[in-house]
């Protein structure tokens, strides 16, 4: 019995101890069970035992937080062990906003976002330590301390207050930086912390100043809208406010939507307060408007309607504005300056009149640049053929394309009745306005050269019989009051321009020029190929008889050889009757003998020509020395006969032609004039009757009797594009075997012109070796590409010639490397036999992409038929093989042309080839 009593006493004492502990805990945190049960969601708190432990108390607070309205930050209330913070962050922001509505809520939200990561990292450790004896002891020690409800007051009666003071943004940043920069020995880094604090303070000060200025712009614009009778819910007002908020977020970083809403609410409240206190005062705002448009569309009448006064003379029968004038007035306490201009004429013949007027306007606006441009046209003026395009292009040429970036299209006579549609039924007013607006906007896009332009359109009606509302304001057929809407568009453009200059959002961007219109990288591979191309040196007229590079090295061998043709026995050619009497074998022997004699005779003529050239060269060298010894002696050319013009041969006809070929139209004479002008034939051009789509000009001359020079140019033009090619070159000798060639080229690359300045010097290393070094510079698309090249030419014996070159070209930080090797093998009797084989190899590296190509070409005679074979292949597996044969005797080769004809017929009949592929 005693044992049972002792057990009951122990149980009772245990229950009393638990009850005492639970009551002390409730008193410690200041929680009224009834209030908790009343304020918490249903089913979460049932009695005082629910908060009998810290873990359960955290659960209860978290459940209550989850039921509260969610915020963007989505912060959850956390009860920590060392700092008992029981006030939810989400509600603190809402309560402060409801009481004062100032920037404290925004600052607190930013603090919460800064503390969010730290709180979430500590949640797991706090949950584990809550149930420990240490946590219970700390809560017991703090049982006598109670927190006040603070600013939240009656809004949260069921939740305890956090006794600890919130961390500021700077303190949170310092705390975070201190933890991140912890050293291995446990000592924090104070240098980085101080730097972070200094940068944060400077950025915050600058950002606050910018926000304050932008807030003043918001207030100013809301006051303007209020003066014009427009609410913040107006489409234009809402769009401008949205753009201001977007610009602020782009300039100063991302901000929450709630902060933007608070800024708008404060600006709206401040604007209403200022307007209520000072309704009659003039605003610190002025707008300058430039008026442009055709004559008779109602520019001056609209100005009078804006000021509600006869500021400008109007006439319905003749132009009333004869000069540029400035009209200044006040509309609803807003200073408005309008630059009225004389009317423009749409005809192409009157463009000089328009240029004179716009020249006067340009001089006038130099004093005060306009904020907005109003381009006037009539709504009832039907035009679908871009008849106003010349006028708009004239405006664009004189003022620049930027004149349309801040332009508003004003359509007068807006009360006109809509015309009939295609079905005979009158169009709706909205469709009528949309069609007319689209035509004017499209014409402006064409004139400005920017198809992205979308100029706003405002409707205007100045007729005295226009319908009005109770306040006497003119109303359009669609129910719109046009005057405040037009002024609101003008003021909105000025406000956005002020915000743009404040936030400096367009330092690198230019309207109408997407992405700053970056200069494109020049085509380096194409320019490098042009640089590596070998060019022949220019020669004086008396040097044209000089031997070629190949024959110059064979002088001794040619002199030592005897003429085999002189040693042949006499030969009598047979007549046609005598040939018919010969047998087939005799006729073949006769033909072989005749071919050998013809070959030896050509060889003899070639050697005689070489000897004659060498003698001429020696005489010219001797004459040059005599001229240097007697510089005053002049040549007497008066006794020479005048050159007689002779007709030049006609252009070669294409392989396929008809009677419409206009070769006879462009016959010309070769005269003594050094200028040679010829037409350029395009066999595959668009014009069948006149295939000459360009002309070519050439001239050779000598500068100071020492420097040979040449000028050549070609211009071609078809329906789609035009091409210009110009080349000027000159050679300068400076020593034996040293020649410098300079040139200037202009050529069309795409839609741009490329200007190239080049120079190369060739000098003889040895008797059979010549080296060339050159530089070049090309200007294209505001970019300069410069490069160098090195070339070496060597002769091996009489039949082999090798040319090796390499170069590099750089431009706009980009580089291209390339080189080529060419080996030529000539026949034994070249150039008489015309047997020649060439092997080429080219390499180019651009952007790490290695391109390797090889080509082989060979030509030889088979009887009297010339055979030419070509083959090329690159490292990407693509290549080409071609064989060509030309003969004047084997006419049966024409039958080969039947093969492609038959192939085309088979493809058309059975559907083979033709680029079709089966799926």
Swiss-Prot record:
Residues 73-88, 574-585 have a biased composition (Basic and acidic residues). Residues 319-323 are annotated as: G2. InterPro entries: G_AIG1, GIMA/IAN/Toc, P-loop_NTPase, TOC159_MAD, Toc86_159. GO terms for cellular component: chloroplast outer membrane. Residues 340-343 are annotated as: G3. Residues 284-513 form the AIG1-type G domain. Residues 641-650 have a biased composition (Low complexity). Its main location: plastid. Its EC number is 3.6.5.-. Residues 412-415 are annotated as: G4. Belongs to the TRAFAC class TrmE-Era-EngA-EngB-Septin-like GTPase superfamily. AIG1/Toc34/Toc159-like paraseptin GTPase family. TOC159 subfamily. This is Translocase of chloroplast 101, chloroplastic. It comes from Physcomitrium patens. The lineage of its organism: Eukaryota, Viridiplantae, Streptophyta, Embryophyta, Bryophyta. The gene is TOC101.
